[in-house]
Curated annotation (Swiss-Prot):
Organism, as annotated: Pectobacterium atrosepticum (strain SCRI 1043 / ATCC BAA-672)
EC number: 2.7.11.33, 2.7.4.28
Lineage, highest ranks first: Bacteria, Pseudomonadati, Pseudomonadota, Gammaproteobacteria, Enterobacterales
Stated name of the protein: Putative phosphoenolpyruvate synthase regulatory protein
Keywords attached to this entry: Kinase, Nucleotide-binding, Serine/threonine-protein kinase, Transferase
Biological function: Bifunctional serine/threonine kinase and phosphorylase involved in the regulation of the phosphoenolpyruvate synthase (PEPS) by catalyzing its phosphorylation/dephosphorylation.
Length: 273
């Protein structure tokens, strides 16, 4: 079964996408997604409504519509469409209003927009991203005292995407350091990292998966061979055990899951932005 899914919002549509994906993941259904942010005017809403209706007429299957829109007139246009419309925020607002005993004050773009209240947090997140980019793949070993976590692992085991996700999603300053083939003859923990052992966290991966990833990057090479991958992983995991560095096999985890596990295992403060 395949269903069309619309994520419609008067803001970035990130909230609609995240919650919509979370709900749909519970069902064995294939989807074709349409993300429509900044639907703030009636003109724009009517165009979206027409798009939904046209798709319904073409396929005969009612599109699913997850929306988050503050302005009533704009919201009503969307809900008048032929789609199966679900307000992904309002379902939680009513019971929360009863519990807090205060009415909500809806404001467009509040979730991911800049306000006087969150400007400092935003600046901290941008600083974390800048730091992470400057300390990617062992580019710099300076200012490691400012890092909140230092990821270690062989090439292509997920260090860079995980570091960037930690910075962008949680404002965590994440450095990462690669162990390459040339290190394997005399693998050791670099002196520059030793003072920060409490910040070190290792990433590993199944050799077969690593070989497949490397094959896409550099096919038919020693670098991508299964034998080379196994050797590197064995050496690096032995190093982790020797220095009592906590580590995680990333083979069956998404970058979101890897990041959440690192935060949990290291007992780090988890801040959403």
């Amino acid at each position: 079964m395949e269903r069309s899914v619309f994520y419609v919002s008067d803001g970035t549509a990130i909230t609609a996408e995240v919650l919509g994906h979370a709900v749909l993941s519970q069902f064995p259904v294939n989807t074709v997604s349409y993300t429509l942010p900044f639907v703030e005017s009636e003109v724009r809403a009517k165009a979206v409504c027409e798009q939904i209706n046209t798709l319904y007429q073409q396929t005969g299957v009612r599109p699913l519509v997850f929306y988050s829109i503050v302005t009533p007139t704009v919201r009503n246009i969307i809900t008048s469409s032929d789609g199966f419309c679900q307000d992904i925020v309002q379902a939680l607002v009513a019971p929360l209003q009863e519990e807090l005993n205060i009415p909500p004050t809806p404001v467009a773009n509040r979730t991911h927009g800049l306000t006087a209240n969150n400007l400092g947090k935003y600046d901290a997140r941008i600083a974390a991203i800048d730091y992470t980019l400057a300390h990617d793949d062992g580019i710099s070993l300076r200012n490691l005292d400012q890092a909140q976590v230092i990821l270690l692992g062989v090439s292509r085991c997920g260090k860079t995407p995980t570091s960037l996700y930690l910075a962008m999603q949680f404002g965590i300053r994440a450095a990462n350091y690669p162990f390459i083939a040339d290190d394997m003859d005399n693998l050791r923990l670099p002196d520059a990292l030793k003072p920060f052992q409490h910040k070190l966290f290792g990433l590993t991966i199944d050799a077969e998966r690593l070989a497949a990833i490397r094959e896409e990057r550099r096919g038919n090479s020693r670098y991508a061979s299964l034998r080379q991958c196994r050797m590197e992983l064995n050496e690096v995991e032995a190093l982790f055990r020797k220095h009592q560095i906590k580590y995680l096999n990333t083979t069956n985890y998404s970058v979101e899951e890897i990041s959440a596990k690192i935060i949990d295992i290291l007992g780090m403060s988890r801040r959403m932005y």
